[in-house]
Amino acid sequence: MVQALTASLMAGALLARGIIGAKADPVNFAGIGGAAYEYNYTATGSFNQSIMPANFTPAGGIDTNDSSPTYHPFSDFDYQSLSLALYHEYIEYDLFNYGLTKFSDAEFDEAGIDAEYRHLIRFMAQQEIGHIELVTNMLGPNAPKACSYQYNFDTVGSFIDFAQTLTKWSESGVYGFLPHLDSRAAAALLLQSITTEARQQMSLRQLQGLFPYPVWFETGIPQSFAWSLIAPFIVGCPAENEKLVWQNFPALHLVSPPVHTNFTNGSFPQYPNGTYMYPAAVSTNRTFPLSLPGQSVELAWDAPGMAVGPNSSYITSTSAGTPRYAAWISQLNVTYAPLNITGNNSGVTYQPSSHLYNDSTQQVINGTNFLVLVDEAIPVTPFNITAINEHVVAGPLVYESG
């Protein structure tokens, strides 16, 4: 049985059976469970304030009557976060165009990606032009410039898979910091950009023959998770680009891949000739999932101190101790499963079988998930997910399930 503890929005609810020994009690929320909490606002539906700031506009909200919004960073946090988003827009533009030129029409056709689907990918690249201009304009004249990149895919299927993975962690990275931006106007524009990217990721899943969105909620991750994932694919950047502040964690590797391993790309099943066992479709209800709850997951991880990123100018680091748990970050939850050390920087854990809410049908681990190794199982929720950073030993690893 998988032993796990999920720190979730279900106050006080231990969503998996067989709780690990190290206590990490979930946060309690009044009205859902746990101790009562005194809120400053009484949520009854009746007006707490009789005076409205404008017609048909209840009191409250942030900058709702701002007549001249400022779409610009208000802090170092804003600048560094928006710059990270821009780095992702640049690589996505490069990736979509590179993939379309690397493979011939015949190779795409053989993999089930016909001319209509290729045009969709081409339009995704065009969307990135708008996203790049948007974020660059908000950052101003000192915004980072485009870099040079490297990719390790060699088939159409692995190109689509990497594009789906990249757009997912880019999307999740923005969800992680968006609520914390000081510039609410900049956050509003970035939201309109990242929701477009969410549609890209869904379409790429459909091109893989995957179920388009097998989750109830999308996942948010810290900036350092997104930066750790993108940095290895950046070869070099212009000298005028200032270094980003975000941490690069040691890499985490999947030794035993998900269920489908006897095909050319273990991330999703293919026939030996590269065509999809499940062809591109609006929706595909798979008989066999990519991975299963309770299955063993073998991992290996790098030691800190490795040079990564643009011009190898960033060094991986961690402030954590010995890894004790695998933290599975998916949807609203962080679920901790025990890690059994099997060797030097290697170990085994299990895919948790917990559910999003008690008695719900939604498995927590579904779709594209993020896995990190930690030294302590601390309770975190989507709004304070960054608190996990100081406990990360290695990761994140992008883990496909469902």
Swiss-Prot record:
GO terms for cellular component: endoplasmic reticulum. It comes from the Eukaryota. Pfam families: Ferritin_2 (PF13668). InterPro entries: Rds1 (IPR039254). Coiled coil: none annotated. Induction: When cells are starved for glucose, ammonium, or phosphate, when they are exposed to a carbon dioxide atmosphere, when they are shifted to higher temperatures or when they enter stationary phase. Adenine-repressible. PANTHER family: PROTEIN RDS1. May have a function in stress-related responses of the cell. This is Protein rds1. It comes from Schizosaccharomyces pombe (strain 972 / ATCC 24843). The gene is rds1.
